[in-house]
């Protein structure tokens, strides 16, 4: 497979599109949220996807799966409304998605959701749009950061695939002692940001566990500000490995939208986030915003301390650093061309796919002998492959030329 997991890209774009995009006043809704227990600790078995945590919950007697998304201000549900949902009167509520489209938001309450032994009542979520078209049943929606601001502290144990949740202040203090950490501040009532120091400048970013598989992302807009200053420009240009035209695809509630832009790939030997040192990061500028994604949690577990407003990192190897070494992350990706789900390639110069003749804009028409005319068909094929196993691709260029290549799945 490609050097970048298709699901990683699609889910990342979805998370960005759903998180922090609503023009909604949620304060009154969140006041009504109640927990069934006090002074509790619970441990829940979860699924880990490229460092992201997918949590099983029970709703209306059925197990569903929600992505724990620190980049989403509030909960979100894909697809249409279901019988168990309690409608909220939100006639004046509008949404504005990442593609500049607007519409009326459909807000509902989850009357009762059970996460492990903890019951959560009256949890408000936003419903609908086209986001679910690109998820293909991988999970049903998001848990937003609003549950943390309601007083829950959690440990995302990505080493043992566990979620530990508690309302006890100081519960994780002993485990967190001496470990790298960073304070977060709430740019909005339920939207945390962290201060990140790069070799050529510093900025606030979202630490977004819903940016599945992503390391550190910059935007051309922010990079342009640093490029105006001579010393910073020299540092950026010295670290730039590639500058090339590429496609940037955003998936919002209204569907997907592709733009052509110039992307820089910048190698950063070190990045500082509080007392955490992130090493060997390869950063793309082809993004709508600056963020740090779930790739960090492929190498470390995470404690979110709601009382201290702090992220604590527990590197799996016992050190105080995280080595990303994510150059392959930017080599090749497959993104939806439009709402139909037809996939087109985004290829970095010098990559294996590039050397084999695949180019940005080529369409994926076949994988392992099966025609590909939608996202979910390809995902089903890919999930049958283990890392290192090869997939036989057939691409078609815009001029009709067919290209047959074999590339192994990398993760």
Language-model features: where?
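Bacterial Sec-dependent N-terminal signal peptides
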Residues: 1-24
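Pepsin/retropepsin-fold aspartyl endopeptidases
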Residues: 21-411
